[in-house]
Amino acid sequence: IPLAWWATARLLRLDVPVRAQSDGETPPGKSPLFDRASVPLFLSYAGAGLGYILPMTFLPLLAKDQLPADHWLLDGAWFLAAVATILSPSIWNYLGAKIGDLPALRMNFVVQLAGVLAAVILPGALGLAVCAALVGSTFVGTVMLTQRIGRALHPHQGPRLSAAMVSVYGFTQMAGPWLTKQWLEAGGT
């Protein structure tokens, strides 16, 4: 709570200048949010939301089905994912600065895919541990890199773009488990 009070006091002291607008300029927020440049980013971000939430939602269930009752990964898979999540932002930030945000985001998606496939292809504890570490390591990187790319595409859309992308990501994270349930009840595997 003291940190929250300190942060609030600092935020209240911020002096954010109002941007002057020329007559011929489109007012911020009045140009389209979805266009040829941003739609692929939104769609890939939605896919990343599904790619993250599905393995993370069902990781404990997979662990329970594949491991003995006293195995440390029953609870430890979440710990591995958390440690990977904590360590990853600086890595993805470095890669984004070094090779560019778009190539880093593509790499992030490949790492996420490898993590999802590990849970399916590698049996038992190894697959679950690799899934937790790889998928966990991509979560914050996906968000950070996508937000930066979005702001580069539409610098004038800052808050609107961020809000729309967070909404898309959140929607897919809520819809993913429900869609999976429907799929499984319909006989899917």
Q: What residue ranges belong to the model's regions?
A:
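Structural signature of the two symmetry-related core transmembrane helices
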Residues: 103-118
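A late C-terminal transmembrane helix in Major Facilitator Superfamily
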Residues: 154-188
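Transmembrane alpha-helical cores of Major Facilitator Superfamily
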Residues: 46, 79-83, 133, 163-171
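C-terminal membrane-cytosol helix-exit motif in multi-pass small-molecule transporters
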Residues: 2-22
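Extracytoplasmic gate region of multi-pass secondary transporters
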Residues: 37-86
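Helix-to-loop junctions at the C-terminal end of transmembrane segments
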Residues: 87-101, 184-185
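Paired small-residue
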Residues: 126-134
